[in-house]
Amino acid sequence: MLDTINGLPAHPLFIHIVVVLLPLSAIGMIALVVIPPFRGTVQKYFVASGVVISAIGAFIAKESGAALEQTRGVTDEHHAWGNRTFYLAIALTVVSALWLWLDTQPKSKTKLATGIIVVLVSLAAITSTVLAGDSGAKAVWETRASESDVVPTVDSQESGAQ
């Protein structure tokens, strides 16, 4: 179902939802928790929407990655970071929803503790996204780059320099 789009592997297309939106949404949640003047209704809806779409995107990326794995294989490292990113996107959705609800209530220690958890999960989600992307890019491009024996250089005599 999620293996190809128009004959191309779907995974490289879907991961961009996660690579762009998950870190932005995580930063948005950190801003909501840490900067009270940023807590306007519009900001909350935008950030919350981004968090939910990120989690959905992480699921789609995970499933399309599993389909790609069947045909092309994948490194264990990329598989592990991809799974962590998916679970952290789900965790961020849950703790963000809880914190957003608690933000409508009077100040409490629960809200403070949940805010700290939101910040920590956000930082973990950003880190996991970067490491999943890095390991995926290495899996795709390291072998292709090493297969190329030709390294373009400019010879000073050929360029006319004396």
Language-model segments: residues:
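Polytopic transmembrane helical bundles with strong interfacial aromatic enrichment
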Residues: 1-162
